Amino acid sequence: MATLNHEGTISTFYGTVALRQAHAAAVSGDVITLSSGTFLSTDISKAVTIRGAGMDVTKVNDIVNEPTILSGNFNIKISAEDTGRLTLEGIYHNGNIIFSEGQVKNALFLKSRFKYISKSGSCKVQDLTVLNCRISESISVGSGNSAQLLNSVVNYFLDGYMSFSHCVILDSYYLFKDGNEYKSCIICRGGDFESGISSSSSAYNNLFISDKADLLQSVPNNTNLRVPTSDERFAYLRGYNDSKDYKLTDQNRDVLKATDGGEIGIYGGSLPYSAIPTNPQITKFNVASKTTADGKLSVDIEVKSGE
């Protein structure tokens, strides 16, 4: 089920095409809320908010019973004249998302699991924020465009000016990209083609799991730490899997502190990682099989607030 909120007026759509129908009826600024279940993806041409029930397909979260899954690739093509903000929250997507047309400004991807995010053509992507997300393959916003990633797990990244804070980056190959920023992250070895950090980038209080001795050659400060890939304390962090929580342990938590003196990685800082959506979730919905003697039907609903 999908509900569309347009200035307080609620419309409801059903079935796997519910998102497509809700988006077609929406205007910029509207809110589309999706229940748990699978929905066919739709190209997004309006700066709307799309909120799902959660991204957690592993069911380790006690609030999100079932995830909201979007099926199929989709494009984001929002006109430069659209001044609204696109927000995607609480969804699981295992296809390709392409910024393909127009200009996307200040978009927010929140508490979602994505596979592949990229840009094509002349589309401009300005100040994309990715918070409490998982990206199982890669993210790229294209040369000259920008994104900040906060408390998120990223398999690897490509083009664009990227700022990473309290992230886990699982493939460090593109560290050579110019102008990036890395703070309080855990950054793993980049396969057979590992590179050092660009001299035009900045890096503070990051843990690098790498055998490249000169990895930090261009970073003159002494706040970063490199440990070899043979260090068993961190072996479990390497490689992407939806079931991994990427938590530090009592054995390795104090090896390096973040810029704020707290924990590095996705559970540190002021926005620690959580898969729980911010919108309230229906966690129990029971309807009696028959009415009472006086014609009443018993309905038992339990709602837990989001974060």
Q: Which positions does each model-derived feature cover?
A:
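Acidic glycine-/aspartate-rich tracts in secreted/extracellular proteins
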Residues: 36-38, 54-58, 208-215, 251-262
